[in-house]
Every structure is written in structure tokens, then in C-alpha cells.
């Protein structure tokens, strides 16, 4: 759907009118925003990160990973959309969930990531591993809000699992944060 989704087309029209722009200018901005948000999922990137994490992180940090309840999730995923809402105490949170799912033959989720993580090299790798980026604030930009909403709606409609962190950001102390 992208910029052709009804909600986005309406927001483009509103943007063009409110900012005295042509439809072409507003549509161009909508495409830039869609590119800013969207993941660019790549099996090769997932395989690369899996090998890297196995060799240099998981086998050195953990003695093992105790996974419980995955069969129930696998069963639910056959007929329901899955949204994971883990706590976010460290960077390991999103990496570990995707790693476990991948190793158990399930597709890792698309992960909502703060726009601050969209930096050179790291941002591209995260995007290819399923991260989609979101700004901390949506206020004052109806076009961005429409693009983001349309993107998440499309992921859900296509049956992709999504991972959001209710706290909004990673804890700096290791303690759970209040949801935002």
C-alpha cells in the first residue's frame, strides 16, 4: 500500500493544502517518510547476525537459554496476528527473542525501533533484520502519523509478527520502566 493507502492519500492532500504545496511535493515527502520508517527484511542479514551472535555473544554470555511456551505461540501464529511486548532492560531483549524464534523455525518479528538507532551501518543492518523505525513523537506531523499507521496496519494485514516495547525505550538502570 505505502503512499497509496487511503489514510496516506488523505494526509498527503491535507499536507499539500496546509503547506501550500503541490501534490507532487507532498507525495515526495510521503515517500521519504515511508523510506524512513520501513524495514527492508533480508534473509542474508538475518543469517549473518545469527552467526555473529552465536559465535561472539550467546555462547560466551549464557550457559543456555530456557525457552517456555513457544509451542503455544507457534499454534496461535497459525490463525492470529502476534504482537510481542517484551520488557526492554537491555539491547539483548530484542536480539534474544528474534534469535530464539529463528532457531526454532519461526520468522522473527518486525521490531519497532527508535529513530535514534537508524545510524550509519547499524541502522541498515537493523532494518535488514526487520527493524522499522519510529520517531519519539508523532505530534504536529499528520503525514508521518498516517505513514506509520499505514505501515503497521500493512504488517498486521499481511500476517507479520510485530515487536513493540511498552516502555518506549531501553532502561538505563536495568529496572523495568513504566509503559508510555
What are these regions (language model features)?
Residues 1-163, 168-180:
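Membrane-interfacial terminal anchoring regions of lipid-handling membrane enzymes
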Amino acid at each position: 500500500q505505502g503512499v497509496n493507502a487511503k489514510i496516506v492519500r488523505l494526509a498527503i492532500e491535507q499536507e499539500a493544502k496546509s503547506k501550500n504545496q503541490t501534490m507532487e511535493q507532498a507525495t515526495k515527502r510521503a515517500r521519504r517518510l515511508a523510506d524512513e520508517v520501513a524495514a527492508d527484511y533480508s534473509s542474508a542479514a538475518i543469517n549473518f547476525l545469527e552467526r555473529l551472535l552465536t559465535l561472539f555473544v550467546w555462547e560466551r554470555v549464557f550457559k543456555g537459554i530456557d525457552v517456555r511456551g513457544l509451542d503455544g505461540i507457534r499454534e496461535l501464529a497459525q490463525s492470529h496476528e502476534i504482537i510481542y511486548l517484551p520488557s526492554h532492560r537491555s539491547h539483548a531483549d530484542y536480539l534474544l527473542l528474534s534469535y530464539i524464534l529463528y532457531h526454532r523455525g519461526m520468522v522473527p518479528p518486525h521490531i519497532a525501533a527508535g529513530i535514534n538507532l537508524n545510524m550509519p551501518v547499524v541502522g541498515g543492518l537493523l532494518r535488514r533484520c526487520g527493524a522499522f523505525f519510529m520517531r519519539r513523537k508523532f505530534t504536529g506531523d499528520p503525514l508521518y502519523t498516517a505513514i506509520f499507521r499505514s505501515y503497521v496496519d500493512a504488517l498486521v494485514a499481511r500476517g507479520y509478527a510485530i515487536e513493540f516495547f511498552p516502555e518506549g525505550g531501553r532502561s538505563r538502570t536495568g529496572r523495568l520502566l513504566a509503559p508510555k
